[in-house]
Amino acid sequence: MTVDINNIVGGSMIKSIKSVDFRYSGRVEKNYTVENEILNYWNELRKKTNFLHESNILTVSNMTCINDNYSIELKDTTFSHFMYSKKNQLGLICMFSGAYIVTSDNYIVCVLNNYYSNEETFQILNLIGGISDHCDIINGQYSSENCLKREFKEELGIDLDQTCFQTNLKFIKCPSEDEKTFTCEIGMIYEIKSLFTKDELTKLFKSSKHDDEVTDLIFFSKKNYRNVYEFSHVKPLIPELLEKIYSEKCIQINKVIVKNR
């Protein structure tokens, strides 16, 4: 797959976004040999983990940007293909929706979740959210918000359609200079404003029914956000995101235009 990364890659991973135009263009083509290699790798991988599940995911086959206006072409493939590509550094780029929560008492919420990489399973500091799925294609159009709502329900047991949550698209995560030749992720990053306090949100998470991917909520404030650098495992975008939020004081509503075709 080829992604047009002119004016996109390099410098900051967390970039401003004015509009995004999604285009769904079918399925990634793979030959018989690659299909067999993927299947064999996946069968071995499933013996090592119990939280990875096969699904049809969406990948970025092309992306362009002009003045913070993005055009993204999507194709679907299997999650096993993505993991195989990740292991072999084949450059497959998946699409994701992710979010942080802003509580009513002004904490920013990320999560600890189970993660598998480089033949190891561990917990990592991450956004809430996950890889976009074929089920997020609705009437032939990709819905990033549908992906986000689905992931919130699965990971936290929280329904984002409740009136106590307000969803705003804030940023786009693009490949860094180091990532551009490897399997990586491109995604929409949302800010979720909540009427719940830190303690209320913690109680809601503990009492809700959800999967076992997310193990804990992690709260940051203006005073302690640099504690992010003390975590053993953290998604590279998280420190940059927190620095951007707190340095620019950008906890506010942005209106981003989302198009589908």
Where are these regions (language model features)?
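N-terminal leader/linker segments that precede catalytic domains of diphosphate-processing enzymes
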Residues: 1-125, 131-150, 157-261
